From Swiss-Prot:
Belongs to the bacterial ribosomal protein bL19 family. Residues 12-23 have a biased composition (Acidic residues). One of its GO terms (molecular function) is structural constituent of ribosome. Pfam families: Ribosomal_L19 (PF01245). GO terms for biological process: translation. The gene is rplS. Keywords: Ribonucleoprotein, Ribosomal protein. It comes from the Bacteria. This is Large ribosomal subunit protein bL19.
Amino acid sequence: MEETVNNQETPETSEEETADEETVAVENTAAGKVLPSFGPGDTIKVHARIKEGDKERIQMFQGVVLKVKQAADGGNFTVRRISYGVGVERTFPFLSPNVTKVEVIKRGRVRRARLFYLRKLSGKAARIKEVKQTPS
């Protein structure tokens, strides 16, 4: 009888397995923070803690999500932006204590899970269609 109870609890606790590949909502239990759900094509702003010498500050990195990797150790996501004409990509772990906050600026409509083709595009060709929000 105890085995049945354990089998019933397992699907409820494994939210990571039932999460959609394109969107992810991760709860960092160590820091007690919840990241919003986002996926490839979304424009997000990541607030990252940067330590320079003995000083510490928050740096914002806004860009398009290229990929979201979900793994047993929490996974990571890659964000790309164009800075002074040069493409800059940063990969952030979901469970990193250096990621203080993630804001979703706009939702993008894409048909791929990995948007590496954006690396070759520039200007208007690199635009992503925005998801139309239906009024509730």
